[in-house]
Amino acid sequence: MPWIQIKLNATNENAEQIGDMLMEETGALSVTFLDAQDTPVFEPLPGETRLWGDTDILALYDAEADTNFIITQIKASNMLADDFAYKVEQLEDKDWEREWMENFHPMKFGERLWICPSWREIPEPDAVNVMLDPGLAFGTGTHPTTALCLEWLESLDLSGKTVIDFGCGSGILAIAAIKLGAEKVIGIDIDPQALQASRDNAERNGVANQLEVFLPQNQPEGLIADVVVANILAGPLRELAPIIKSLVKPNGDLAMSGVLDTQAEDVANHYRDELHIDPIAEQSEWCRISGRKQG
């Protein structure tokens, strides 16, 4: 099946907002951010700004998408200059896969954690390295929500602990938790393809025996963990709050993302009855809500 790709250039200040607009208002199937200077892609430490000064945005659409409508919507957003440059091209499946692989670089989170495409050389062999091939599942580390969760996991002492990755996607958070010292991780997702991607990536990282994955309806009864991370969306975080809170042991830790800054307080309020909520962490309008369950 062919695809349509639209390439735009943006500054580091507005790239995330443009990406969100392309997904929400033009029907983009995926949005990828690339450093226009083709230098390695790094995720910043908390409080630091993105290193890119010039960012290319690649938006992928179904072959039947109306490109005139898409360009009109981009212009109407007033996020780019009236005479902004863009490139439209048709990609066959194999061309898109090659393009994606060529542009997915190793990324560093905090002081010691690297997320590395399985086909790339490891930049720091002595660091904590997660080898990743996302396949059809969400989660490469390039989005602020994933970065916020990875940085939070790295900040914890996970030695000997059990972790639940609620909405595991590609398994990036689950595998990172194991690499950071967790004894066992349970991944839960509504998408069978995500479970398979998580299994494959765990096998690639040599941690398959420490990861179990389940559809929600198949998860063990009474499941509970020392640490729970849920990188999903604000709506499900509100609706599923009783379930998510029940997964956390007393005095256990919970982090949630997939939440915009305008949604953070409302989502946090669904958890304050059982958790002491930390100051909300923000990155590019996205937030992480974390806290410790009362004993």
From Swiss-Prot:
Q: Name one GO molecular function term.
A: protein-lysine N-methyltransferase activity
What EC number(s) is this enzyme filed under? 2.1.1.-
Enumerate the PANTHER family for this protein.
ELECTRON TRANSFER FLAVOPROTEIN BETA SUBUNIT LYSINE METHYLTRANSFERASE
State the similarity comment. Belongs to the methyltransferase superfamily. PrmA family.
Question: What are the UniProt keywords, alphabetically?
Answer: Cytoplasm, Methyltransferase, S-adenosyl-L-methionine, Transferase
Q: Tell me which GO cellular component terms the UniProt record holds.
A: cytosol
Q: Which residues bind S-adenosyl-L-methionine?
A: 146, 167, 189, 231
* Pfam families the UniProt entry points to: PrmA
Methyltransferase listed as a keyword? yes
Predominantly, its location class is: cytoplasm
Enzyme class, spelled out = transferase
Q: Which HAMAP family match?
A: Methyltr_PrmA
GO BP annotations, alphabetical order: methylation
For the keyword S-adenosyl-L-methionine, the answer is: yes
Name of the protein in question: Ribosomal protein L11 methyltransferase
Q: Where in the cell is it found?
A: Cytoplasm
**What is known about what this protein does?**
Methylates ribosomal protein L11.
Top-rank lineage group of the source organism: Bacteria
- Which reaction does this enzyme catalyse, per its entry? L-lysyl-[protein] + 3 S-adenosyl-L-methionine = N(6),N(6),N(6)-trimethyl-L-lysyl-[protein] + 3 S-adenosyl-L-homocysteine + 3 H(+)
